[in-house]
Design a protein with these regions (language model features):
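N-terminal cap/leader regions of alpha/beta-hydrolase-fold enzymes
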Residues: 1-222
Length: 222
């Protein structure tokens, strides 16, 4: 990990009422670190996790795809992958975090990055969750089981890309549990995307996510 003089990578941190818990890194979609993703960290804290979110857009947020495309292309103080790697180090070192490994949850663009992190050697990842984000590659270095939530109709994630992801995970012998939610589209789990939000599918995906994280991360004594 290269040393930098940058500010901390973690922008938003939510601690559970108990004051400690397994760590979970939340990687936002291309909208930026908006109220939904901050609220997601709070929900995770309410479930007993220490949830942390880096701001990959350095304070900027988008509400339309056009704005999001522009923000995604703007110059950054450091590459996104380095920000995420620093965030993992910071979260793992937080005294509120218990257990040897942390989890990562990513949405859309963030899901793509969560799967990139899952491919990197030597990271303390014990669980990977992707919401409608797919990324094929070499998962031979991954030790983290994967949970995926996907829309039935998705103009951003093709059936071919999802098939490639499945094959990549299978080739590496990784455990993967994928769910497709009928009648949904991309961003179906995000409450602020009112045109596509599906409350029933979102709550089912949430309950599966929490159960998965507890199973993979929670030490027996907690």
């Amino acid at each position: 990990m290269p040393k930098t003089n940058l500010s901390p990578a973690i922008t938003y941190l939510a601690i559970p009422p108990s004051g400690q818990g397994p760590g979970v890194l939340v990687v936002h979609a291309w909208w930026g670190l908006n109220d939904f993703f901050r609220g997601l960290c709070d929900r995770l804290a309410g479930e007993g996790f220490v949830a942390a979110a880096p701001d990959l857009y350095e304070g900027r947020v988008a509400t339309t795809p056009e704005e999001a495309k522009r923000l995604r292309g703007l110059p950054k103080r450091e590459p996104t992958n380095q920000t995420l790697l620093r965030a993992i180090v910071e979260l793992r070192a937080n005294p509120a975090v218990v257990g040897p490994n942390i989890g990562v949850i990513g949405f859309s663009m963030g899901g793509h990055w969560a799967l990139w992190l899952a491919q990197q050697p030597g990271l303390p990842l014990g669980a990977t969750v992707t919401y409608y984000g797919a990324r094929a590659g070499d998962y031979g270095n991954s030790q983290a089981p994967c949970l995926g939530h996907f829309a039935e109709t998705d103009e951003w994630v093709s059936p071919a890309s999802l098939k490639k992801l499945r094959k990549s995970l299978e080739a590496a012998g990784r455990v993967a549990d994928f769910h497709t939610y009928p009648g949904t589209g991309h961003w179906f789990a995000e409450t602020d995307r009112t045109d596509v939000y599906d409350s029933q599918a979102a709550e089912l995906a949430w309950s599966r996510t929490v159960a998965f994280l507890r199973r993979q991360l929670r030490p027996p004594e907690l």
